Structures are given as C-alpha cells and as structure tokens.
C-alpha cells in the first residue's frame, strides 16, 4: 500500500467538472466521446448536447452500460495522486489533473465505486483483457504528471502486461 499524506479532500482538485468554452463540462465531453452525442434541438437553451443512450460494453466489466448508470473514473485516483505528490501542486495543476481526459474513463458506477482510490496492487479491472490497457493508461498519466508509482503497483502492472510488448519504457516501470 502507498504512504498516505494527510490533508486530502476532493475539493483540493476543484469543486466539480470544469466548464468548457463550448458550454459543456468535462463530464459531458467524456460521455460524448464514449456514447456519441444527440444533436441539440434548434433553439435549445442548453448548448451542450445529451449523450446518445445506446448501450456499450463497459471497459472494466465488459457488461453493457448506458449514460444513466455510469461514472467517470480517474484512472489514477485523486486521493492516490495526492499521496504520490499532488499535495505539493498548485491548485490550477490539481484541477487540470482532475479534468484531464487522459485520466478519465467512463465506467459502470459500481465498478468505479469498487475501485475507489486503489492502485493496481489493490485493484485491477475484473476482465483480464482490460488489465494491460488500464495499466498502460495509468502509467501514461503518472508519467505525464511526474508521479512515481509504488513498486508493488509497478509489479502488478508488469504482470498485467506480461507477454505484451511496448507497455512502458524502463524509466516508468
């Protein structure tokens, strides 16, 4: 398990999803990129279109999900990022991290709640076929924000990708 740094609160990473210039939020954009968007009706007061309601296969569980039963997962959880160094960042960097599309994935709400703030040594997607992609994405986010992952997590990430070439450079793992 990682060392815990006191003082974490969700609000340290902003009060919610960032509002974007087009009137959408980071959450809306993630839903659109996952499900597609329904064009807004002419004259609609809401500039952000609704996501399509067609089910897709959830990336962690493989079960069907729709926009009504999902949450956005921070691939590298905010509390974990805090413990790994985000506690020392300025507020704008923490807010950018919380809203970075590289670190967000639309998943079944239950899967996100099960994962909580755990890193790979404590939690991996239940579907084996998703584990290497998850490890790769988490490593990319950690690298982008210069956060060093604990050895136990790196070991689990390597295990998830054993036999898969090109996961990470030697520096990251």
Please give the residue ranges for each predicted region:
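Domain-level detector of nuclease and nuclease-like folds
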Residues: 55-173
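N-terminal module-boundary/linker segments of secreted carbohydrate-active enzymes
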Residues: 1-22, 151-155, 166-173
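Glycine/proline-rich, flexible active-site/cofactor-binding loop segments
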Residues: 6-67
